[in-house]
Amino acid sequence: MTQQNTTLMPREKLLKYGASSLDDKELLAIFLRTGIKNCPVMQLSELVLAHFSSLRGLINADQKHFCQMKGLGITQFVQLQACTEMTKRYLLQELQFAQEFTSPDTVRMYLQTELENKDREIFMVLFLDNQHRLIKKEEMFLGTINQANVYPREIIKTALFCNAAALILAHNHPSGVSTPSMADRKMTENIKQLSELMEIRVLDHFIIGKGNYFSFAEQGWI
């Protein structure tokens, strides 16, 4: 990075070099816009990140915790929630308008934004057509903090109803650890076998943890 680059203010640096050139503190400073009394915006940004440990911690904070931080309030909370939701919808639209699912990373990022911070286990299915384009996504089963009862026949029933040719399975582990259990492996195999009887392919099963994930396809388990 050049000396000129390091002396630019965040807004000017973004305009000249792009958003990816900014670090977390600089990005947050643009979002905050102004500092508070005796605390310039860059210093406030640094304090906020230290308080929440990371951007992820800030984004995941509930309203009460968020607004307890000096310099933050309901306006910033609402704006941040709106930005987060727009990101989710952008990723979903990327999947919806893609000609086919050629980017597993886009699928993973979307599933992470949807499932990573849920406090209950949710089992989601992406239903795809024969060219692997998204038909619909559906939260099929909602469970407790550590378990969701999954009924493979209900998944197949929905797949047949929307004429899906392929499926991507996903669920979260609220514990934060994405390592699959034996029950996860058995359930995935049951869905795969039942799907094959109906000539429907299971392309992958993602398990989403806190800042980590597990892909059955990447491990060669599907």
Swiss-Prot record:
Keywords: Hydrolase, Metal-binding, Metalloprotease, Protease, Zinc. Residues 99-222 form the MPN domain. The keyword Cytoplasm does not apply. The keyword Zinc applies. A motif (JAMM motif) lies at residues 171-184. Zn(2+) binds at H171, H173, D184. GO terms for biological process: proteolysis. One of its GO terms (molecular function) is metallopeptidase activity. Signal peptide: none annotated. Belongs to the UPF0758 family. PANTHER family: DNA REPAIR PROTEIN RADC (PTHR30471), UPF0758 PROTEIN YEES-RELATED (PTHR30471:SF3). This is UPF0758 protein HSM_0009. It comes from Histophilus somni (strain 2336). The lineage of its organism: Bacteria, Pseudomonadati, Pseudomonadota, Gammaproteobacteria, Pasteurellales.
